[in-house]
Amino acid sequence: MAQTITSLADLKQGPGAEPAGLSAEPQEPKLDKEGRAYATGKRKDAVARVWIKPGSGKIIVNGRDLGVYFARPVLRMMINQPFSIVARVDQYDVMCTVSGGGLSGQAGALRHGISKALTYYEPALRPALKAAGLLTRDPRVVERKKYGRAKARRSFQFSKR
């Protein structure tokens, strides 16, 4: 009998292939020897290396507590955003090292790294984090300074006479 073709993806696969988007087995979590998920997050010039494991919700940044390293509540809320979106608040311990950039960029890198590590630990959380835009690396960086100008776009003061 002829196989029914319902989409362009089915046509590309050829005969006897499994339909697109359907996998037989669920994805396995990517864990190290100690049972932690590792990921890196980036934002502007900041790079965060993140390890997560099940625990009480403690977050350690560069050997210091989250509240000590990030004093502004907005930054702490930004870092905890991945956990609140997938309803996993106070279920994972996070240990991370952050370098480069300023505090805002570091918080963004940390949020990106935590989101990626959560998807490695629980692959089922990926659609929710992807829909919230937390798995996408923010490509916005500082525009470079051009010669003949004061800054990236600001010109030197012009005098007619």
Curated annotation (Swiss-Prot):
Basic and acidic residues composition bias: residue spans: 27-38
Annotated region (Disordered), positions in chain: 1-38
Keyword S-adenosyl-L-methionine attached: no
Keyword vocabulary terms for this entry: Ribonucleoprotein, Ribosomal protein
PROSITE patterns cross-referenced by the UniProt entry: RIBOSOMAL_S9
GO biological process: translation
A cellular-component GO term for this protein: cytosolic small ribosomal subunit
Database matches in SUPFAM superfamilies: Ribosomal protein S5 domain 2-like
Highest taxon listed in the record's lineage: Bacteria
Record keyword DNA damage present: no
Coiled-coil region list: none
GO molecular function: RNA binding; structural constituent of ribosome
Family, as annotated: Belongs to the universal ribosomal protein uS9 family.
NCBIfam families per UniProt: PRK00132.1 (NF001099)
Protein name: Small ribosomal subunit protein uS9
The organism of origin for this protein: Rhodospirillum centenum (strain ATCC 51521 / SW)
Gene name per UniProt: rpsI
